[in-house]
Amino acid sequence: MTPSETPSENSSTNSLVLLAINGAAGRMGRRLVALGSEDPQLRIAVALEVPGQPLIGQDAGVVSGVSAINTLLSAELAAGAAQAMIDFTVPVGCRAAIKLCTAQKLPLVIGTTGLTTDDHQLIDEAAKTIPILQAANMSLGVNFLLGLAAQVAQKLGDDYDIEIVESHHRMKADAPSGTALAIAQAVCDATGKSMKEDLVHGRLGAHIPRQRGEIGMHAVRSGDIVGKHTISFGAIGEELSLTHVASTRDVFARGALRAAKWLIGKPAGRYSMKDVLGL
């Protein structure tokens, strides 16, 4: 239900955008606050956290490792305090953000992963009244990778076996990653394959030969890996691999901040990073 319009940088970026960060004390939230505070087009006006979070009441900038920004971590969002929200939390936190933004008619950027079918239905329903941009990965490189993976899969066909391997830090809770699933979905959309019928998660057993046309999916959890995604196309005698490596979470944060500025003033609907980047 993405509205069709030519992507362009929103004119509202010429004035200061008041931004709310949901999960501001989290790993991604801190980078959003830190980088957002450096952006001359933005003001981090609201830094949300769950009730009872020990850091509530402290300056969000200081918590994020930068200078004070005169915005305190809070569990409440006053009406009119922000013009858009970015959510990088967990599914339950994302649901709360969707309901809050719907009630206050705020544009919402969602970077939370691990969302269920019910969560996506909630997003679809909310997008009838507010603009929502949801993406498994906000980085420019990954969004180009999605397009490349789809093109290669379509051109090479089932003579080439597709395997997707994603690697993340040991603390990541959901598997496979939202980005890996997005890559698989891009391949399915381009080839007519089915996420339900053709996607195989790992392999275990004494006799499990690979089936023609299936898409293998594998998850690695180790150390402090920010994010690595590889899709390989293997045939007899050759293999083609496309890999994206994120060495810092800042690529996701910068993409989300860019998306939030772009989303201001857009009509209700569901958007993606493709709309922001004009892909």
Map each language-model feature to its residues.
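Short, ordered loop/turn segments at secondary-structure junctions
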Residues: 50, 113-115, 137-138, 167-169
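Rossmann-fold NAD(P)-binding glycine/threonine-rich loop
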Residues: 92-104, 111-134, 143-152
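N-terminal Rossmann-like NAD(P) cofactor-binding module of classical short-chain dehydrogenase/reductase
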Residues: 85-86
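Intrinsically disordered, low-complexity terminal tails and inter-domain linkers enriched
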Residues: 2-15
